[in-house]
Amino acid sequence: MGRRKRRPGSRRWLDEHHSDHWVQQAQKAGYRSRAAFKLLEIQEKDRLIRPGMTVVDLGAAPGGWCQVAAELVGDRGAVFALDILPMEALPGVHVIQGDFTEEAPLQALLQALEGRPVDLVLSDMAPNLSGVRVVDQPRAMYLAELALDFAGQVLQPGGDFLTKVFHGEGLDDYRRDLQRQFSKVITRKPRASRARSRESYLLARGFGL
C-alpha cells in the first residue's frame, strides 16, 4: 500500500532500493514493484490464483500484485483494486481510489463487485511506519482486521485470503481468528521481502469450510 513509502531523504533506503535484486528484476520483467515477486513465489507454492477467478486486491498501488493477478485470471476473470493513492490503469483491473478505513471507498468497491462472489482477497496494506513498534503494530493489525472483515463479507465458500502481517502484539489472536473462519492457515515469508522486515504473509484457505 502506498502509505508505507519512505521519505525521499532516506539516503540509505534509496541506495538499497536502486541496488536491490528484486527491484532490478521487477524493472526487467515490466512489473511496477518488487512486491510482484512476493505474490509470484506464493503462487508457485500454493497455486492460489487460477483462470476465471474474481480477485480483490487491497492496498494495491502501484499495482505489482494486480499485474500478476490479472495475468493469471485471464480474460474470463476479474481483478478489483483499491488504494488510497492513485494508480495507473491496468488491463483487466477495475481500480478504485480511496482510504479503505473509510466507508465511502468500501461501498464503492462493494458496488463495483455487483454482488459477484469473490474467490480471493489479497491485502498488502500497511500503515505509515513511524519506527516505533508500539505505535506501528496496532495500526498494522487494524488494517489486517479490516481486510479480514471485508473478506468475510465477499468471499464465497471455499474462498481464500492472503494478508500482510507484522510480527508483534495481536498477531497470535489474529491467526486464531483466521483458523476459526478458514480450514487452513499458512505463514509465508517470500524471498522478495526485505530481510530486516518484520513482515510476513498469512494465507488462509477454505473460507467457511
UniProtKB/Swiss-Prot annotation:
Record: residues binding S-adenosyl-L-methionine: 63, 65, 83, 99, 124
Residues that span the membrane, as ranges: none
Assigned EC number: 2.1.1.166
Enzymatic class: transferase
Pfam families documented for this protein: FtsJ (PF01728)
GO cellular-component term (any): cytoplasm
Gene3D superfamilies the UniProt entry points to: Vaccinia Virus protein VP39
Catalytic activity of the protein: uridine(2552) in 23S rRNA + S-adenosyl-L-methionine = 2'-O-methyluridine(2552) in 23S rRNA + S-adenosyl-L-homocysteine + H(+)
Superkingdom field: Bacteria
One GO MF term: rRNA (uridine-2'-O-)-methyltransferase activity
Catalytic residues as annotated in Swiss-Prot or TrEMBL: 164 (proton acceptor)
Keyword list, A-Z: Cytoplasm, Methyltransferase, rRNA processing, S-adenosyl-L-methionine, Transferase
Localisation per UniProt entry: Cytoplasm
Primary subcellular site in the record, as a coarse category: cytoplasm
PANTHER family: RIBOSOMAL RNA METHYLTRANSFERASE (PTHR10920), RRNA METHYLTRANSFERASE 2, MITOCHONDRIAL (PTHR10920:SF18)
Stated family: Belongs to the class I-like SAM-binding methyltransferase superfamily. RNA methyltransferase RlmE family.
Entry function: Specifically methylates the uridine in position 2552 of 23S rRNA at the 2'-O position of the ribose in the fully assembled 50S ribosomal subunit.
The protein's name in its UniProt record: Ribosomal RNA large subunit methyltransferase E
Species name: Alkalilimnicola ehrlichii (strain ATCC BAA-1101 / DSM 17681 / MLHE-1)
Gene coding for it: rlmE
